[in-house]
Design a protein with these regions (language model features):
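Conserved G1/Walker A P-loop phosphate-binding module
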Residues: 1-73
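Hydrophobic "anchor" residues on beta-strands that sit immediately upstream
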Residues: 63-65, 102, 130
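Flexible beta-alpha connector loops of hexameric P-loop NTPases
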Residues: 71-81, 137
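Catalytic P-loop NTPase motifs of RecA-like helicase/translocase cores
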Residues: 72, 110-111
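Inter-motif core of Ras-like GTPase G domains
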Residues: 80-108, 120-127
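Acidic (Asp/Glu) carboxylate-rich active-site/surface patches
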Residues: 115
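Active-site glycine-centered loops adjacent to acidic/histidine catalytic or metal-binding residues
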Residues: 134
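Single conserved hydrophobic/aromatic residue that forms the stacking wall/gate
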Residues: 138-148
Length: 148
């Protein structure tokens, strides 16, 4: 894993990159851990805004998964948001190996304005995207739990 705050310090622009995008706490890092079959590969947290860099994960010699910081986190400072916007713009505009974006949305809050903006961002840079609705499992009390 390699995290960068400046795209010039990113791994070589080769092979195939698939970017994981979405609002804070939409399940990007959890999905990455699931795909890699390693629960500790990407840092997860119940607190939004933990991923602060673009994190590159080498899956094979040819394939990288790229975990982006979540967007839409209201407590992010104006300066941090501006830096994040600049970083994302430089990533999407410069990476020739970027094949597609997987945009994660919590099924309880799908298609927020920030999700639409990310889709428009992908369209601007001609990056195909795949929307994925994630399910946040909530605790079901015993009396309401179905019997299977």
């Amino acid at each position: 894993m390699q995290g960068v705050l400046n795209i010039k310090k990113a791994p070589p622009d080769e092979g195939f990159e698939f970017v994981l995008a979405g609002r804070s706490n939409a399940g990007k890092s959890s999905a990455l851990n699931c795909l890699a079959k390693n629960k500790k590969l990407a840092r997860t947290s119940k607190t939004p805004g933990r991923t602060t860099e673009i994190n590159f994960f080498k899956v094979t010699e040819e394939i990288k998964l790229v975990d982006l910081p979540g967007y839409g986190f209201s407590k992010m400072s104006v300066d941090k948001k501006k830096n994040l916007d600049t970083l994302l713009d430089s990533y999407f505009s410069s990476r020739q190996s970027l094949c597609a974006a997987i945009i994660f949305m919590d099924i309880r809050h799908p298609l927020k304005n920030s999700d639409i903006q990310m889709m428009e961002f992908c369209h601007k840079y001609e990056v195909p995207f795949i929307p994925v609705l994630t399910l946040s499992l909530i605790h079901i009390s015993e009396p309401t739990r179905p019997n299977f």
